[in-house]
Amino acid sequence: GTEAFSELVTGEVVNVLGPLGHGFDTTARHPLIVGGGMGLSPVLLYAAEMTGRADVLMGGRTAGELFWQKLYAPLTGQVFCTTDDGSLGTKGFTTTVLPELLQQGDYDLVVACGPEIMMKGVARVAKEHSIRCQVSLEKRMGCGLGACLSCSIDTTTGQRKKVCKDGPVFEAGEVFA
């Protein structure tokens, strides 16, 4: 995977199969994107696809981890930041400011990508505010087609789903109780 990509030489041809699975809902009127750490990378394309309709709440340990704000700013309405050390934006986690944003904003969807503990917290807060929430799960995937079952997860209804085929985006209530 990553090691093979790092050894590629400019001009080399790479075969890619995709996109696979399901993405975030692009029909939302005013979504709030919540990303933490490296989880900000996968939702950047979603922000671009939403053509200024989305706001973003990003969290990181320090201001240095939130270089993403420069990439998101031209694509989104508002950019809100939280850092563990308070070096940029509000000191704390994304869930520190999320309740206030959901109370004041006119959001019809929350999309989250980042550490699982963050996404669980975001899903809980969104549920408390009766706002639909989707999360993007990360699992090691062997085949990407659903055949090998290496990315299988248990849902809240007891069903088994494959992150590669049925996800990686799920309704939060489907994967977090």
Model region roles, listed by residue range:
Residues 1-32:
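FAD-binding FR-type
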Residues 22-81:
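Hydrophobic, well-structured mid-protein blocks that either form specific transmembrane helices
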Residues 17, 34-35, 57-59, 113, ...:
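Short beta-strand segments
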Residues 2-5, 23-25, 41, 85, ...:
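Residues at secondary-structure transition points
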Residues 62-177:
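Reductase modules of NAD(P)H-dependent flavoproteins
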